């Protein structure tokens, strides 16, 4: 497990936006992670974090509270993939579409009076 202390919460959102890897997200927020799991599900975890953060209003929070909220959201997203696989979670559209019920194609209708 890798972990690091939470950095000073000076504009944590800007620091996360400039992060270049999933590992940087975990290190900036001080969240422990298993490198093997992160190698498999990094994009899925970050996408899920983004989905969870979309419902948060971090702009008006003090820096330390925003950092704590981001940390909690990343821990929640990571926990989703500890408990199940990316295939089970289906975060991305291509995975959702793979199991979506297909609408049956209706045969083309040609009324009899249109035939000559």
Swiss-Prot record:
It comes from the Bacteria. InterPro entries: NifW. One of its GO terms (biological process) is nitrogen fixation. Keywords: Nitrogen fixation. Disulfide bonds: none annotated. May protect the nitrogenase Fe-Mo protein from oxidative damage. Homotrimer; associates with NifD. Belongs to the NifW family. NCBIfam families: PRK00810.1. This is Nitrogenase-stabilizing/protective protein NifW. It comes from Rhodopseudomonas palustris (strain ATCC BAA-98 / CGA009). The lineage of its organism: Bacteria, Pseudomonadati, Pseudomonadota, Alphaproteobacteria, Hyphomicrobiales. The gene is nifW.
């Amino acid at each position: 497990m890798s972990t690091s202390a939470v950095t000073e919460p000076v504009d944590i959102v800007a620091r996360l936006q400039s992060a270049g890897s999933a590992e940087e997200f975990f290190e900036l927020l001080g969240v422990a992670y298993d490198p093997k799991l992160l190698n498999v599900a990094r994009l899925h975890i970050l996408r899920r974090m983004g989905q969870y953060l979309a419902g948060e209003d971090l702009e008006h929070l003090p820096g330390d509270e925003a950092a704590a909220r981001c940390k909690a959201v990343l821990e929640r997203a990571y926990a989703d993939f500890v408990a199940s696989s990316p295939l089970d979670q289906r975060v991305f559209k291509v995975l959702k579409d793979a199991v979506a019920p297909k609408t049956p194609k209706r045969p083309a209708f040609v009324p009899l009076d249109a035939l000559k």
